[in-house]
């Protein structure tokens, strides 16, 4: 239905433009006063009448489509923009691209939403030498508002703000739809492909805390786009190529000479890496052999390739333990995947005349970028620049991506801006058509506000960090004596949910561009905007129906038969807050700042607490505790909050539990 509404809206606009053009032509012919043009005039008038008739039919069909029930949640801001866009066009038909500003109101006294277009329109009219007061413009806009299902009333405030009050029936119906059909968005990304490049550790090195942010942010972005209906390809651009493999293979040959026939028990790959690095730095003969191994690997020597694969497999097993723990799914496509494309990349840039030679290197200067790309080293080797150019081309032409998102730290910002600019320069993509974006992020700091390290100054291993999280979350649960009321299975589920949920939420709840301080004490605090608080809040909400002996089937029956009342101010506030979910997600789809979702879930939880403290869902006898009355419409509000929170958690990669 959403696609049909969009198509109808586009056709409406087109026909309105045609009518405007024909009306102008009719007026011109009338004003000419030349009777010889009467045949033309009659023909134009007839065409105009036909168009107006068709326009009327289209408008009716569009309204009929809008009135049909939809299974998707409505983005209230988008719907209000449609309504006010229509009003502005009707009030000021000659203005091209007038500003359309609809935002949630900051205070209840200003209504539920505000349209702040009048001031911008006043400025546009001033450039046409028409001085009109913004308040007059606001009044003119409100006079042209079409009939719609969502607005109860509008008020003009201040210099020209239009305060919008939603209809209670509209909000109630949307909440009922959410409960009956589940939390669903319109298929915004239908037939669109998104590639998310994230995590990307190096083979033979353990993942450390520096990889944590890319992995968590990238997974969450992927989940969001999947929920919005996009075809998402999650890529792990691992470092599985380069000179370091020469020393690893040479060390493997020495330590496990029968590696071709007997699987080598490498064990701790980190130790293995350090041993080979030490030899590479101190033994000249070993260093020469390491370089020979690199050449043989590039030449696809079968024995050397097998050694390389063995090392990659051992490393991959360790990486997968972390991905499994964090519930992250990725397709591995490392630097090795692009090796056979490198020569063609260099040739394409040469053929187009973009290559300069500098001290034996082949470099490419990109307009607007201060540092050139090095696409071929003086020794004939390729660079990260070459492999990243090969990757972006493959993703654009073979994968046919509509959007590519690179989740890599802020330190790589200049590099990626240069890669993107080079890809545009050579004509691989048009930024107006294809979105290529670097979702950068800051570093993880310790509580001393320096880079997060162990006490001995080593980089913190990610597996150790997650293990510490599990230990601390269990300590917290036992401190609250949850081990005495939960089964062993429930206790373990709660431990994992809190440990990994808190680590993810602490990251995602900060603006990704900023550095953030890693503190287990803060992230496990069950007060404030933390996963611990929200997970506890979620289990409390889920328990309300259970403690009132209301099961899932009864709730579903009530959702279809019981009208959700929003008469109490806290019911009304909560209902509106629930409906903001689609507009929050749309904002994140645009800017990729996931802390907005965390802030929203926290706001939803605190708004629910206000509601629950003021509005009885279950009324009990004060002496006996016996249930006297269940206010089912309020139980449904609880259920709607839980449904939206559950979907929010899912997008953030957090697994809530029913009991905690």
UniProtKB/Swiss-Prot annotation:
Region spans: Could be involved in the assembly of the multisynthetase complex: 1-72
Name of the gene: RARS1
Residues found modified as N-acetylmethionine: 1
Coiled coil: none
Family: Belongs to the class-I aminoacyl-tRNA synthetase family.
Catalysed reactions, semicolon-separated: tRNA(Arg) + L-arginine + ATP = L-arginyl-tRNA(Arg) + AMP + diphosphate
Keywords (A to Z) from UniProt: Acetylation, Aminoacyl-tRNA synthetase, ATP-binding, Cytoplasm, Ligase, Nucleotide-binding, Protein biosynthesis
Source organism (scientific name): Pongo abelii
Superkingdom, taxonomy of origin: Eukaryota
Motif 'HIGH' region: positions: 201-212
Places the protein is found: Cytoplasm; Cytoplasm, Cytosol
Main location: cytoplasm
Matches recorded under Pfam families: Arg_tRNA_synt_N, DALR_1, tRNA-synt_1d
Enzyme class: ligase
Stretches the record annotates as Interaction with tRNA: 529-543
Domains: entry comment: The alpha-helical N-terminus (residues 1-72) mediates interaction with AIMP1 and thereby contributes to the assembly of the multisynthetase complex.
One annotated GO molecular function: arginine-tRNA ligase activity
Residues that hold L-arginine according to the record: 200-202, 211, 384, 388, 412
Protein name: Arginine--tRNA ligase, cytoplasmic
């Amino acid at each position: 239905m959403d696609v049909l509404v969009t198509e109808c809206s586009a056709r409406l606009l087109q026909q309105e433009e045609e009518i405007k053009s024909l009306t102008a032509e009719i007026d011109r012919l009338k004003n000419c006063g030349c009777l010889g043009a009467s045949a033309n005039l009659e023909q134009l008038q007839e065409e105009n009448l036909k168009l107006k008739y068709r326009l009327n039919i289209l408008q009716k069909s569009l309204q009929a489509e809008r009135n049909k029930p939809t299974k998707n949640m409505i983005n209230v801001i988008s719907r209000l923009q449609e309504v006010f866009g229509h009003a502005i066009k009707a009030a000021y038909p000659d203005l091209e691209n007038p500003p359309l500003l609809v935002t949630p109101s900051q205070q209840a006294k200003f209504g539920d939403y505000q349209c702040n277009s009048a001031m911008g329109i006043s400025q546009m009219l001033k450039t046409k030498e028409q001085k009109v007061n913004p308040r007059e413009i606001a009044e003119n806009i409100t006079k042209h508002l079409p009939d719609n299902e969502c607005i109860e009333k509008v008020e003009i405030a201040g210099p020209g703000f239009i305060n919008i009050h939603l209809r209670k029936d509209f909000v109630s119906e949307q909440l009922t739809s959410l409960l009956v059909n589940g939390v669903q968005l319109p298929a915004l990304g239908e037939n669109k492909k998104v590639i998310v490049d994230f995590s990307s550790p190096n083979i033979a090195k353990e993942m450390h805390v520096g990889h944590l942010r890319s992995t968590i942010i990238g997974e969450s972005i992927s989940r969001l786009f999947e929920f919005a209906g996009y075809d998402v390809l999650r890529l792990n651009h691992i470092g599985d190529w380069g000179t370091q493999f020469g020393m690893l293979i040479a060390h493997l040959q020495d330590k496990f000479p029968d590696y071709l026939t007997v699987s080598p028990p490498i064990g701790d790959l980190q130790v293995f890496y350090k041993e080979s690095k030490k030899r590479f730095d101190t033994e000249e003969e070993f260093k020469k052999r390491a370089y020979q191994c690199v050449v043989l690997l590039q030449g696809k020597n079968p024995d050397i390739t097998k050694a390389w694969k063995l090392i990659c497999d051992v490393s991959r097993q360790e990486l997968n333990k972390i991905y499994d723990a964090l519930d992250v799914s990725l397709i591995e496509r490392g630097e090795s995947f692009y090796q056979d494309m490198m020569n063609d990349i260099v040739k394409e840039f040469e053929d187009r005349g973009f290559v300069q030679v500098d001290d034996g290197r082949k470099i490419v200067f990109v307009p607007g970028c201060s540092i050139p790309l090095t696409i071929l080293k003086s020794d004939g080797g390729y660079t990260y620049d070459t492999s990243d150019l090969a990757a972006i081309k493959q993703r654009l032409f073979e994968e046919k991506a509509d959007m590519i998102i690179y989740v890599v730290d802020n330190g790589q910002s200049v590099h990626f801006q240069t890669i993107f600019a080079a890809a545009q320069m050579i004509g691989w993509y048009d930024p107006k058509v294809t979105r290529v974006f670097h979702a950068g992020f800051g570093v993880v700091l310790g509580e001393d506000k320096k880079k997060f390290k162990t006490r001995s100054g080593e980089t913190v291993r990610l597996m150790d960090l997650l293990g510490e999280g599990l230990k601390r979350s269990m300590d917290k649960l036992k401190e609250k004596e949850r081990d005495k009321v939960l089964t062993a299975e429930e206790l373990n589920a709660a431990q994992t949910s809190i440990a990994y949920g808190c680590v993810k939420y602490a990251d995602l709840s900060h603006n990704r561009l900023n550095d953030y301080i890693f503190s287990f004490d803060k992230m496990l605090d069950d007060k404030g905007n933390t996963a611990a608080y929200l997970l506890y809040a979620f289990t409390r909400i889920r328990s309300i129906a259970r403690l009132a002996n209301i099961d899932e089937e009864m709730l579903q029956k009530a959702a279809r038969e019981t009208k959700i009342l929003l008469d109490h101010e806290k019911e009304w506030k909560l209902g509106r807050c629930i409906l903001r979910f689609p507009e929050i997600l749309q904002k994140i789809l645009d800017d990729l700042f996931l802390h907005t979702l965390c802030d929203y879930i926290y706001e939803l939880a605190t708004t629910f607490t206000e509601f629950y403290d003021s509005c009885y869902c279950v009324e009990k006898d004060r002496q006996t505790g016996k249930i006297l009355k269940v206010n089912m419409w309020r139980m449904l509000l609880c259920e709607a909050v839980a449904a939206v929170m559950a979907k929010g958690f899912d997008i953030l990669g957090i697994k809530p539990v029913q009991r905690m």
